[in-house]
Each structure stands twice: as C-alpha cells, then as structure tokens.
UniProtKB/Swiss-Prot annotation:
GO terms for biological process: translation. Belongs to the universal ribosomal protein uL14 family. One of its GO terms (molecular function) is large ribosomal subunit rRNA binding. GO terms for cellular component: cytosolic large ribosomal subunit. The keyword Ribosomal protein applies. This is Large ribosomal subunit protein uL14. Part of the 50S ribosomal subunit. Forms a cluster with proteins L3 and L24e, part of which may contact the 16S rRNA in 2 intersubunit bridges. It comes from Ignicoccus hospitalis (strain KIN4/I / DSM 18386 / JCM 14125). It comes from the Archaea. Binds to 23S rRNA. Forms part of two intersubunit bridges in the 70S ribosome. InterPro entries: Ribosomal_uL14, Ribosomal_uL14_arc, Ribosomal_uL14_CS, Ribosomal_uL14_sf. It holds the Pfam family Ribosomal_L14. Keywords: Ribonucleoprotein, Ribosomal protein, RNA-binding, rRNA-binding. The keyword Transferase does not apply.
Length: 137
C-alpha cells in the first residue's frame, strides 16, 4: 500500500539524457558544451547508466568554453531536452536541443542570463533559475 505522502513527490519527467550525453550550456558562465558525468541522488541497478530529465541536477565536465571553465567539474540543471515529455494537462513538450544551466551546490545560477527558453518543470523545482530566465515555456 502506498502512503498518501508518497504521492507528493516531484512529478516524473521522461528522461531524455544519460551519463555521457553532450549538452549545450545556455548561460553566460563561460562554458559552451558540457558532458554529463553523474546524476546525484540516482540509486539504480548495477551497471545501469543513470538517466536525467528536465529539472534534474547533474554533474558535468566542461568540454568547450573559456580557458578558465574548460575541464572543470561543476553542477548543472537540465532546462531543455529533445525527447518529448507529457505535462499533466496532456500537452507534449519537446525542445530543439539538450541544454543545461551551470549552478552552484545549492542551485544558484553561476551566470547572469539564460539564453533561449527554459522548461516550466525546471523553474518550479529550481526557482532561482526562473529569476534569470528570459523565456519560461
């Protein structure tokens, strides 16, 4: 039997990314392209590749960007994914690219602006991203 409080957990978004995925960095922190190397909090089966979706925090390594940012291991929030996911009202949402925003440990964005749209699911879970986002879809 499922407890009533168990239903209040976050909404499940279809995961369109995994460890090893290259993603676009959509803020002005200095990074351009990053690779996902971990998903904090994921406890899965042995040898299963951890998945990530919109609104999830991931650990990335910066592959392209300014010399200060390159080869750094930082945290990021997934704000867009190509894989379509369904919202509770029945609409399907898919973006043109897979994109992340680099953040600190507590979820504060490192950059001062976010280019392009940001999924509403990411803003609901990480409100500080919504303060810097130009468009929330």
């Amino acid at each position: 039997m499922v407890k009533a409080s168990a239903n209040k957990s976050r909404r499940k978004v279809v995961t369109g990314l995994q460890v090893g995925s290259y993603v676009k960095v959509t803020d002005n922190s200095g990074a351009k392209v990053a690779m996902i190397i971990g998903v904090p909090g994921y406890h899965g089966r042995l040898r299963r590749i951890p998945p990530a979706g919109v609104g999830d925090m991931v650990v990335v390594t910066v592959k392209k960007g300014t010399p200060e940012m390159r080869h750094q291991v930082v945290r990021a929030i997934v704000v867009r994914q190509r894989k379509p996911f369904r919202r509770p009202d029945g609409t399907w949402v898919a973006f043109e690219d897979n994109a992340v925003v680099i953040v600190s440990e507590d979820g504060t964005p490192r950059g001062s602006e976010i280019r392009g749209p940001v999924a509403r699911e990411a803003v609901e879970r990480w409100p500080r991203i919504g303060n810097v986002a130009s468009i929330v879809v």
